[in-house]
Amino acid sequence: VGSSTLLLAFTLLDKPRMLSRADLPRLLVLALLGHTLYQFTFIFGIDRTSASNSALLISMTPVVVVLLGHMTGQERSSSLTWVGVTASVLGVYLVMDPSSANGGSIVGDLLILGAAICWAFYTVGSKSLLGRLGPLRLSAYTMALGSLFYIPFGIPSLLRLPFEQVPWTAWLGTVYSFVFALSAGYFFWYYAVSRLGATRTAIYSNLTPVTGLAIAWLTLGENVSVRQMLGAAVILVSTYLVRQSRITETEV
C-alpha cells in the first residue's frame, strides 16, 4: 500500500496520460500476476525450498520471457539470444552453493517456478500499455490494483500485530522495502522494458546472484570458489551476448 501510494503521488509530476476503460481488464491481470501472485508464490516458495533451488528456478524467467515473446509474436529472437539465455541459467547453477541444495521440496520448487512464470507474463504483457501510459503510471496503477488483492489476507494479520513490540530496525526495513525494492524496483524494471525490450531486460535479472556473490565477498569476507567465479563469468558473457543479439520487436 505504501509503495502504490508513493508511485501514485509521483504520477502527479508526470505528464497526463490517457487511461481508457478498456485498459482496466489488462491492468487487473498485470496487477494480479506481477504483484499479488508473484509475491505470494515467491515468498511462500523460498520458505519451502532451498536457496539454491530458488536461485536456479527463478533464473528461468528470461527463458519464459523469450518463449512468451515468440508465442505472442512480440519479439523474434535470434539463435544467439537463445544461446545467451540458456548459458545464463547454466551460470546461475554454477554460482549456487551446492551445499544449500538440501532442504528443498517439490511444493516450494513449484511455487518458485510459478513466480518466474508470473513475472514473465507481467513483463511481456505490459508492452501495449507501456507505450501509452509510460513506466511510472503503469507501475503505479498495477501496484495500486495489486494491493487490493492483499486486503482479505493483510487486514487480519495487521489487526493481530503488536505494533508496540515491532523494533525500529523492522520499521526501517519496511520503509526501505517499499521505497527501493518495490517502488523503485518496479518502476526501473518497466522503464528498462520500455527501452530495451522484455528479453534484454529479463536477462539482467540473472545478474542478481553475481551481485550477491560480490557483496558477500567484499563486506562479509566470504570465500568465492573457482566454480562460482566461472559461473559469474558465464552469466556476464551470456548477458553481453543477449544484449548484442538481434531481437526483432513487433507492435501487438
Question: Where are the regions a protein language model picked out?
Answer:
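Membrane-interface helix-cap regions at the ends of transmembrane helices
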Residues: 3-19, 40, 87-103, 145-171, ...
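Glycine-/small-residue-enriched transmembrane alpha-helix faces in small-molecule transporters
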Residues: 101-128, 136, 149, 250-252
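Helix-helix packing/entry segments at the starts of transmembrane helices
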Residues: 1, 39, 54-60, 123-148, ...
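Cytoplasmic-side transmembrane-helix entry/capping segments in multi-pass membrane proteins
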Residues: 22-30, 77-89, 108-109, 133-143
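Transmembrane alpha-helices of multi-pass small-molecule transport proteins
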Residues: 1-37, 64-68, 118-125, 139-159, ...
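Structural signature of hydrophobic alpha-helical transmembrane segments
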Residues: 1-2, 43-61, 105-118, 169-179
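Specific transmembrane alpha-helical segments of multi-pass solute transporters/efflux pumps
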Residues: 8-53, 57-58, 94, 178-196
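Hydrophobic transmembrane alpha-helices of multi-pass small-molecule transport proteins
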Residues: 6, 28, 60, 68, ...
